[in-house]
Amino acid sequence: MQLPAMSCSPSQSSAAAAAAAYGCCQRILLASTSLPATGRPARLGLKLRSTHSLQIRNRRFVCQAMTETEPDGDGNGDEEKEELGDDASSPSVDSVTQENGSAESETNADNTKDETVNTEPLSSSDTVQNIDGDATPASDAQENVEVVDVAVGSPLPGMKQQLDESVRIPKATIDILKDQVFGFDTFFVTSQEPYEGGILFKGNLRGQPAKSYEKITNRLQNKFGDQYKLFLLINPEDDKPVAVVVPRQTLQPETTAVPEWFAAASFGVVTIFTLLLRNVPLLQDNLLSTFDNLELLKDGVYGALVTAAIIGVHEIAHILAARDTGIKLAVPYFVPSWQIGSFGAITRIVNIVRNREDLLKVAAAGPLAGFSLGFVLLLLGFILPPSDGLGLVIDPAVFHESFLVGGLAKLILGDALKEGTKLSINPLVLWAWAGLLINAINSIPAGELDGGRIAFAMWGRKISSRISSLAIGLLGISALFNDVAFYWVVLIFFLQRGPISPLSEEITEPENNYISIGVAILLFGLLVCLPYPFPFDPSQLTDFDL
């Protein structure tokens, strides 16, 4: 074998000293990697961060083992340190002194069994040689080092896979996060574990969640800039706060093959057609004759405009609230429906929402505006006489389909509302009712509907997911008897079932006034959807009903 070239005079004794010096290095490694109880070689996953070197000090060869290892937690570290200390105290282990001369460039034949001294750090292509002679690739040995290899995929609920390669979060970064980003004044970390696209930290939250989140975020930006994103969430397993840090590159917005504006425009054109079709009773009875009688669609313009106005106000309110809270919305997709004209619009949130209150503001703004305009128009329809003096002749039994509309009809029309007696009303009633129904079905607390987001913002992820499952189940049962419910539950299941993307900080609850608005919206939507069970004519009450 060859030793590193030294500038010293050759002699046989110096060569023997060099060989003995390298032997001492081997014994130090043996002492540091042997199991203390049995003396057997330890199969530990190690990462050698330095190397063995030969140094010249005052004409002496000094062999130093400068290894820094990270053993697995199964070994007894204290006993290993004691054994290493005993060996290091022996002069035969620490150093070998040669008074005259220096090492030759090559060793004698007696030292041919020794291995070459590695004077360079291990590279990723090197292998780690175990004491018992088994060679393990360095890439396998590094798996036991505390370096997190994050799997490609959804970093958090609601996030989509965007990366083609995995993201590596080094141990040094995790240590900085634990020791310098988090702290006793914000979030005291007790443990951490890989969490899909990042690292989940468990611990104790200190102070108000919103203020603690702001402090942690500022420290994170000071250390790493915009490289990482912090989420402060509730662990659904134990309902305790957890902090999740993920690389921002895993949070890239989802891209689509078809431009959003093109798809949205296509859906919008079809929705206009179904809104017109919905307000032409002659075509409703025979849909196949629609294309042969397109001129009849002009009769549905006024009804389509009223319903579209209610839907439009709903979406405009979403946009204004989102602009006020810094939330970015995608292009709305209007969903056509031949039964009621439209199911409203599907609007994605494309950035990360700051907290639950901001989500509640945006989610509640649409139904609040839509319900307000629809309710006013419904009242006007009951109060104002038909413009042509004739109006629209209907069977009063239709009002039993909605508790809200049936109650208003009974309150305003009074004795004129009788079972089995035809009634002439202003068509504005039906137009406004359709707009209210569209807002109501979007207020169902399920998935990523407005109602689902409202429930999430008010009660958190765990409770809202249970409410969502219950709502979808009840909607599925009603789908057996109602075709509108059938198509709506199918649409929710395939397009809107969630989960809702994580918020930056999900712990702080909204203010009570916003919660009151959210509850009112859910109740109002329920009144629109539930049937009116009471007869309109008191004379038709039976003894059983009384």
Curated annotation (Swiss-Prot):
Residues 69-86 have a biased composition (Acidic residues). Its EC number is 3.4.24.-. Residues 1-64 form a transit peptide. The gene is EGY2. The lineage of its organism: Eukaryota, Viridiplantae, Streptophyta, Embryophyta, Tracheophyta. Belongs to the peptidase M50B family. InterPro entries: EGY1-like, Peptidase_M50. Its main location: plastid. GO terms for molecular function: metallopeptidase activity. Signal peptide: none annotated. One of its GO terms (biological process) is proteolysis. One of its GO terms (cellular component) is chloroplast membrane. Residues 67-143 are annotated as: Disordered. Residues 89-110, 118-130 have a biased composition (Polar residues). It comes from Oryza sativa subsp. japonica. CDD domains: S2P-M50_like_2 (cd06160). This is Probable zinc metalloprotease EGY2, chloroplastic. It is a multi-pass membrane protein. Probable membrane-associated metalloprotease that may be involved in chloroplast development. It is an enzyme of class 3 (hydrolase). The chain crosses the membrane at residues 257-277, 301-321, 326-346, 364-384, 427-447, 474-494, 514-534. Pfam families: Peptidase_M50. Keywords: Chloroplast, Hydrolase, Membrane, Metalloprotease, Plastid, Protease, Transit peptide, Transmembrane, Transmembrane helix. It is found in: Plastid, Chloroplast membrane.
